[in-house]
């Protein structure tokens, strides 16, 4: 079977829906391939076309490079209201804690897909890491009080027993990403869902959300 006709980027039929769609016709037909109204020698799975002389870049058939293995990660998935406005976060950074540690250890700038393709939202996030016990998290007074007051009621209502039990932690803490970023000063990040592929450098003090992919390399 083959794709013999396709329209790669069309508006959705319903008014008001911010959606674009691709339309594909495939089967055993031997008719000449047509992509977006133009004749093509072959239509690839990503709806790009080979030229008449067969020259093309067939990305769906590309093989992964060994050098890139274990270098790209999805950020944390919070599944609750751990995110806070930047002004509130910065006010917490100046507050003392019983154990003398700074709130900067658990209050971090946060990045999602919209921050990459639109104006930065100045959103921060409370992040108690991967396995910090509740008793240790509670020593960060203001962040923990917020999470206990705002996040815990949300976590109490979820189906996952582990998320209810560890309500002060993100649902997915992205241990693999954190390990890969250890010792680096910056990482490259891109939105998972975006019309255009944009890559941006961010310092490792920034915590990435599950809406972005993080490349754990700091070299140019």
Locations of regions flagged by a protein language model:
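Signature of N6-adenine DNA methyltransferases within the class I
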Residues: 1-105, 118-123, 133-138, 199-213, ...
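Short coil/turn segments at secondary-structure boundaries
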Residues: 37, 105-110, 121-126, 157-170
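Short secondary-structure capping/turn segments at boundaries of alpha-helices and beta-strands
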Residues: 96, 112-113, 176-177
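Short, flexible beta-strand-to-coil junctions
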Residues: 112-116, 192-196, 217-219
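Catalytic nucleotidyltransferase
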Residues: 128-129, 140
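Flexible, glycine/threonine-enriched loop-and-boundary segments that flank and lead into catalytic domains
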Residues: 142, 146-213
